[in-house]
């Protein structure tokens, strides 16, 4: 397995992976999300590749105060092999190299399987409530 930065030729394969991982929501246009990330800071957009196939992704961010991770997903046939752990570990190392003191990950309430994985990796529940506001409307996906 190789973990590397997203390349433009990964575009369609990544969207297909996100569909298989049930990461897409109608209010988020994955093509726009990728385009925005590539134009902002592609170095924190990582893919895991096995035998030339993209089997995992994580999209990270850092605003100078805290890091974040989004679109963490692993192809269902490749789960249980440590790929998600490896992606998060690589992202954490990149964030630490930038001086990032902490990372935040938002997880849907009903995603118990992933919550357990994050807890095993040292992530803790916070008492903060996450609020959001759409600033630019995307086309429904």
Curated annotation (Swiss-Prot):
Gene3D superfamilies xref list: 3.40.630.30
InterPro entries: Acetyltransferase_YpeA, AcTrfase_GNAT_prd, Acyl_CoA_acyltransferase, GNAT_dom
Record-annotated N-acetyltransferase domain positions: 1-141
Pfam family, one: Acetyltransf_1
Top EC group: transferase
SUPFAM superfamilies documented for this protein: Acyl-CoA N-acyltransferases (Nat) (SSF55729)
CDD domains, sorted: NAT_SF
Keywords tagged on the record: Acyltransferase, Transferase
An example molecular function term from Gene Ontology annotations: acyltransferase activity, transferring groups other than amino-acyl groups
EC number: 2.3.1.-
Homology family: Belongs to the acetyltransferase family. YpeA subfamily.
Protein name (Swiss-Prot/TrEMBL): Acetyltransferase YpeA
Organism this protein belongs to: Salmonella typhimurium (strain LT2 / SGSC1412 / ATCC 700720)
Chain's gene name: ypeA
């Amino acid at each position: 397995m190789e973990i590397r930065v997203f390349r433009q030729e990964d575009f369609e394969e990544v969207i297909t992976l996100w569909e298989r991982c049930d990461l897409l929501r109608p209010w988020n246009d994955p093509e726009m999300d990728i385009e925005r990330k590539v134009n902002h800071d592609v170095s924190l957009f990582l893919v895991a590749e096995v035998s030339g196939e993209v089997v995992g992704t994580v999209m990270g961010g850092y605003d100078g105060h805290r890091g974040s991770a989004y679109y963490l997903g692993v192809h269902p046939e490749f789960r249980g092999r440590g790929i998600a752990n490896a992606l998060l570990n690589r992202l954490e190392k990149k964030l630490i190299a930038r001086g990032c003191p902490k990372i935040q990950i938002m997880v849907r309430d009903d995603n118990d399987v992933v919550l357990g994985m994050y807890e095993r990796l040292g992530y803790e529940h916070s008492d903060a409530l996450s609020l959001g506001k759409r600033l630019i409307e995307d086309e429904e996906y």
